[in-house]
UniProtKB/Swiss-Prot annotation:
Transmembrane segments: none annotated. This is DNA-directed RNA polymerase 7 kDa subunit. GO terms for biological process: DNA-templated transcription. Its EC number is 2.7.7.6. Part of the DNA-dependent RNA polymerase which catalyzes the transcription of viral DNA into RNA using the four ribonucleoside triphosphates as substrates. Responsible for the transcription of early, intermediate and late genes. DNA-dependent RNA polymerase associates with the early transcription factor (ETF) thereby allowing the early genes transcription. Late transcription, and probably also intermediate transcription, require newly synthesized RNA polymerase. GO terms for molecular function: DNA binding; DNA-directed RNA polymerase activity. Belongs to the poxviridae DNA-directed RNA polymerase 7 kDa subunit family. Pfam families: Chordopox_RPO7 (PF05864). It catalyses: RNA(n) + a ribonucleoside 5'-triphosphate = RNA(n+1) + diphosphate. The DNA-dependent RNA polymerase used for intermediate and late genes expression consists of eight subunits 147 kDa, 133 kDa, 35 kDa, 30 kDa, 22 kDa, 19 kDa, 18 kDa and 7 kDa totalling more than 500 kDa in mass. The same holoenzyme, with the addition of the transcription-specificity factor RAP94, is used for early gene expression. One of its GO terms (cellular component) is DNA-directed RNA polymerase complex. Induction: Expressed in the early phase of the viral replicative cycle.
């Protein structure tokens, strides 16, 4: 599952590019060939999060 990613500058949905990076394991250089806006290219290059660890840890009881 890939969380939606929208460019905050131009409003373009770049979830498909993020899917290609995280799930399909396509190189960043290859994915950026199809992205024209510099703002979207920058966001994809710098703000891609690693896959999240969804394990739940118990809360600590401080009392």
């Amino acid at each position: 599952m890939v969380f939606q990613l929208v460019c905050s500058t131009c409003g373009r949905d770049i979830s498909e590019e993020r899917y290609a990076l995280l799930i399909k394991k396509i190189d960043l250089k290859t994915v950026l060939r199809g992205v024209k806006n510099n703002c979207c290219r920058l966001k994809l290059s710098t703000q891609i999060e690693p896959q999240r660890n969804l394990t739940v840890e118990p809360l600590l009881d401080i009392n």
